[in-house]
Amino acid sequence: MEGCVSNIMICNLAYSGKLDELKERILADKSLATRTDQDSRTALHWACSAGHTEIVEFLLQLGVPVNDKDDAGWSPLHIAASAGRDEIVKALLVKGAHVNAVNQNGCTPLHYAASKNRHEIAVMLLEGGANPDAKDHYDATAMHRAAAKGNLKMVHILLFYKASTNIQDTEGNTPLHLACDEERVEEAKFLVTQGASIYIENKEEKTPLQVAKGGLGLILKRLAESEEASM
């Protein structure tokens, strides 16, 4: 069938947005609502992926579990946050989706909202109790992702919710190291004004200033000095 993503028909219907047929089949056999496919995904996972809000709402009204994970550890909330499905994220949170759930990579939904630049979703997750400093298996936080990707507004959002600027990942890099390495000039400047240290060394014994390219290092040094002088 068209939109065939799964070896389970009900999952394909959820992904394709075929609400009436999905309803008909599930009302005839309730067990289909929680049937898992070859990836341990349910109809809810697939509806979240494709952004079919009405199907998600129907499944949630039936009381399907909201926190079941697929074989890569992704919950429906991970999928909806990564795909930018604002209304679905809201519905899942109302039903008690675990906001700090981690997948096989140690990532929370907030990690994906930060790297994909999903502002509204990040705010919903943080308002719902997401840990702004949650670390993945590489000890990277949402701030590392936002800084590396050049998502300035996301950096602002994370700082508003008290995210740390100086956490080091497994390579010893802070968000400022990554911003400098990726030449994210505005993000790097803003991080320095918000307390990001220019002195922390990574595993290569380099500070953010030593990682910075062009004239960025000098700009950040002057910025940090003026911040220190005003304290």
From Swiss-Prot:
It holds the Pfam family Ank. Signal peptide: none annotated. It is found in: Cytoplasm; Nucleus. InterPro entries: Ank_repeat_dom-contain_49, Ankyrin_rpt, Ankyrin_rpt-contain_sf. GO terms for biological process: apoptotic process; negative regulation of apoptotic process; negative regulation of DNA damage response, signal transduction by p53 class mediator; negative regulation of MAPK cascade; negative regulation of NF-kappaB transcription factor activity; negative regulation of release of cytochrome c from mitochondria; negative regulation of transcription by RNA polymerase II; positive regulation of cell growth. It comes from the Eukaryota. Keywords: ANK repeat, Apoptosis, Chaperone, Cytoplasm, Nucleus, Repeat. GO terms for cellular component: cilium; cytosol; microtubule cytoskeleton; nucleus; proteasome regulatory particle, base subcomplex. The keyword Cytoplasm applies. Induction: Up-regulated by activated HRAS. The keyword Cytoplasm applies. ANK repeats lie at residues 3-36, 37-69, 70-102, 103-135, 136-168, 169-201, 202-226. Part of transient complex containing PSMD10, PSMC4, PSMC5 and PAAF1 formed during the assembly of the 26S proteasome. Stays associated throughout the assembly of the PA700/19S RC and is released upon association with the 20S core. Interacts with PSMC4. Interacts with RB1. Interacts with CDK4. Interacts with MDM2. Interacts with RELA. Associates with a CDK4:CCND2 serine/threonine kinase complex. Interacts with ARHGDIA and increases the interaction between ARHGDIA and RHOA, hence promotes ARHGDIA inactivation of RHOA and ROCK. Acts as a chaperone during the assembly of the 26S proteasome, specifically of the PA700/19S regulatory complex (RC). In the initial step of the base subcomplex assembly is part of an intermediate PSMD10:PSMC4:PSMC5:PAAF1 module which probably assembles with a PSMD5:PSMC2:PSMC1:PSMD2 module. Independently of the proteasome, regulates EGF-induced AKT activation through inhibition of the RHOA/ROCK/PTEN pathway, leading to prolonged AKT activation. Plays an important role in RAS-induced tumorigenesis. Acts as an oncoprotein by being involved in negative regulation of tumor suppressors RB1 and p53/TP53. Overexpression is leading to phosphorylation of RB1 and proteasomal degradation of RB1. Regulates CDK4-mediated phosphorylation of RB1 by competing with CDKN2A for binding with CDK4. Facilitates binding of MDM2 to p53/TP53 and the mono- and polyubiquitination of p53/TP53 by MDM2 suggesting a function in targeting the TP53:MDM2 complex to the 26S proteasome. Involved in p53-independent apoptosis. Involved in regulation of NF-kappa-B by retaining it in the cytoplasm. This is 26S proteasome non-ATPase regulatory subunit 10.
